[in-house]
């Protein structure tokens, strides 16, 4: 089902954030509908992939847990995969840690390889890919490696002030949860994620969710998107 990626350790030496000449406000977000006709019919012979996008603190991880419970998806968090590799104490993980501390994006093929391995190890065929892709480079690497586009893309739209407050309050002991790094992460998100959001909006795959409110209030906006799917 999946194509193996080759060794990617050499990519770290050239890792740096890409700068776009146009800011986030330049990109028009095309509103999409959440009718049943827009949800592709999943096939157990191939993966049904949903990308879950949103800035740090937008609540996408929390909503993924609700989607998993209601619709039987497997949650694949790009951030959790990277942190798990860091916790392993491997040399690979040490370089990932340095990259995150500098507020940079981990090389695309590194994250794609970790995601691919996680999907290959699952018996499920429905996946929520949380926090990826974070850039056009990420998007292209995933689609070229996996050989397919996502079926659905969720974007949790949340004001920056609210995201900062949430990240500071959650106190998870993460290496990337200090105020300076949060600001770097938000800046990188604004510069790199909007082209991805715009791309999938124009492809008719994007569902933009207002991520302000209680967990249950936000999930009620998500639920209709996946209503045609059963566990």
From Swiss-Prot:
Listed EC numbers = 2.7.4.14
User: Which residues make up the binding site for CMP?
Assistant: 138
Obligatory cofactor(s): Mg(2+)
Q: Which GO terms describe its biological process?
A: 'de novo' pyrimidine nucleobase biosynthetic process; pyrimidine nucleotide biosynthetic process
One term of GO molecular function: UMP kinase activity
**What's noted on cofactor binding?**
Binds 1 Mg(2+) ion per monomer.
The UniProt catalytic activity note for this protein reads: CMP + ATP = CDP + ADP; dCMP + ATP = dCDP + ADP; UMP + ATP = UDP + ADP
**Which intervals of the chain are annotated as region LID?**
169-177
Major localisation: cytoplasm
Region of interest: NMP:
77-106
Example of a GO cellular component annotation carried by this entry: nucleus
Tell me which domain of life the UniProt entry assigns to the organism this sequence originates from.
Eukaryota
Cited Pfam families: ADK
Arranged from A to Z, the UniProt key words for this protein are: ATP-binding, Cytoplasm, Kinase, Nucleotide-binding, Nucleus, Pyrimidine biosynthesis, Transferase
Quote the record's binding site residues for a ribonucleoside 5'-phosphate.
83, 104-106, 131-134, 174, 185
Residues binding ATP are 57-62, 170, 213
Protein localization: Cytoplasm; Nucleus
Q: How does it assemble?
A: Monomer.
State the function annotated in the UniProt record. Catalyzes the phosphorylation of pyrimidine nucleoside monophosphates at the expense of ATP. Plays an important role in de novo pyrimidine nucleotide biosynthesis. Has preference for UMP and CMP as phosphate acceptors.
Q: Return the PANTHER family for the record.
A: NUCLEOTIDE KINASE (PTHR23359)
Query: Which protein family is named in the record?
Result: Belongs to the adenylate kinase family. UMP-CMP kinase subfamily.
Q: What does the entry's domain section say?
A: Consists of three domains, a large central CORE domain and two small peripheral domains, NMPbind and LID, which undergo movements during catalysis. The LID domain closes over the site of phosphoryl transfer upon ATP binding. Assembling and dissambling the active center during each catalytic cycle provides an effective means to prevent ATP hydrolysis.
Q: What is this protein called?
A: UMP-CMP kinase
What's the source species for this entry?
Prunus armeniaca
């Amino acid at each position: 089902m999946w194509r193996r990626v080759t060794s990617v350790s050499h990519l770290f030496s050239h890792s740096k954030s890409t700068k776009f000449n146009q800011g986030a406000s330049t990109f028009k977000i095309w509103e999409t509908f959440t009718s049943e006709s827009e949800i592709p019919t999943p096939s157990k012979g191939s993966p049904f992939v949903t990308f879950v996008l949103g800035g740090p603190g937008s609540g996408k991880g929390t909503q993924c847990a609700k989607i998993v419970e209601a619709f039987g998806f497997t949650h694949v968090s790009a951030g959790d995969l990277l942190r798990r590799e860091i916790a392993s104490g491997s040399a690979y993980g040490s370089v990932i840690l340095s990259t995150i501390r500098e507020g940079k994006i981990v090389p695309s093929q590194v994250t794609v390889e970790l995601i691919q391995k996680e999907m290959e190890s699952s018996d499920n065929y429905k996946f929520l890919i949380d926090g990826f892709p974070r850039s056009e480079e990420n998007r292209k690497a995933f689609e070229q490696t996996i050989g397919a586009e996502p079926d659905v893309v969720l974007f949790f739209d949340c004001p920056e002030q609210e995201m900062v407050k949430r990240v500071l309050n959650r106190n998870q002991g993460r290496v990337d949860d200090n105020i300076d790094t949060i600001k770097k992460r938000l800046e990188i998100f604004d510069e790199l994620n909007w082209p991805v959001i715009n791309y999938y909006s124009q492809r008719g795959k994007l569902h933009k969710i207002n991520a302000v409110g209680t967990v249950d209030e936000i999930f009620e906006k998500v639920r209709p998107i996946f209503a045609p799917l059963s566990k």
